[in-house]
Amino acid sequence: MDNAIFPNKFKAALAAHQVQIGCWCALANPISTEVLGLAGFDWLVLDAEHAPNDVTTLIPQLMALKGSSSAQVVRVPTNEPIIIKRMLDIGFYNFLVPFVETAEQAAQAVASTRYPPEGIRGVSVSHRGNMFGTVPDYFAQSNKNISILVQIESQTGVDNVEAIAATEGVDGVFVGPSDLAAALGHLGNASHPEVQRAIQHIFASAKKHGKPSGILAPVEADARRYLEWGATFVAVGSDLGVFRSATQKLADAFKK
């Protein structure tokens, strides 16, 4: 049995600034997540912030993705070490941390994923993340194979984005367009010019410090524009959005 889980190919792809197209898993269901895992996306976000997920619902989804080539990214509900530790222990290696506003908060997120002395991650010798103690050199390899993506979604985050991007251990900077729009006074209008300028600034700041940038963009024209602006990892839709759109289209086709 091959118990090798490293190296982290998604982390390596981000470091090489290779475009990674992703999708959001918001339905919190292993079957819908398994279907997305068959589609060929480079990465999938299993959302534990806005979707009804916790460790008990995420484990079946990770199992459903076992044969998938898509990298699994978890968006944690908050930047708390104990939450991140539990996500590590169930098998996540890629983290999207919401509402990061300072370099100190970014550094805390990184430290939460690292074993001492580089960080503060608690040690369990046997858990799902290390295949219950069967992964060779897990403790030696883990720290350098965890990826941290920090989410900028406030004016304070925009103001501090250069320091955040420069933080050691941060692998990428992600824009939360809806919350950013709300924070800038344009709730429900991420297309507002002020929001778009802020997004460009975030992308440019990440690039300045050699870090890839990402964003959620379920509208194709938006996604393509952000890729042209230099975004590296772009989530182009969600299972919920695709399901809602397709079912409405099907119903409309027969009820009109």
From Swiss-Prot:
GO biological process terms, semicolon-separated: D-glucarate catabolic process; galactarate catabolic process
Membrane-crossing segments per the record: none
Textual note on the cofactor: Binds 1 Mg(2+) ion per subunit.
Pathway the protein takes part in: Carbohydrate acid metabolism; galactarate degradation; D-glycerate from galactarate: step 2/3
One GO molecular-function entry: magnesium ion binding
Binding positions for Mg(2+) per the UniProt entry: E153, D179
Keyword Lyase: yes
Enzyme Commission number: 4.1.2.20
Catalytic function, reaction form: 5-dehydro-4-deoxy-D-glucarate = 2-hydroxy-3-oxopropanoate + pyruvate; 2-dehydro-3-deoxy-D-glucarate = 2-hydroxy-3-oxopropanoate + pyruvate
Sorted UniProt keywords: Lyase, Magnesium, Metal-binding
One CC-aspect GO term: cytoplasm
Binding-site residues, substrate: Q151, S178, D179
Oligomer and partners: Homohexamer; trimer of dimers.
Family to which the UniProt record says this protein belongs: Belongs to the HpcH/HpaI aldolase family. KDGluc aldolase subfamily.
Identification of the protein by name: 5-keto-4-deoxy-D-glucarate aldolase
Organism: Klebsiella pneumoniae subsp. pneumoniae (strain ATCC 700721 / MGH 78578)
Designated gene of the protein: garL
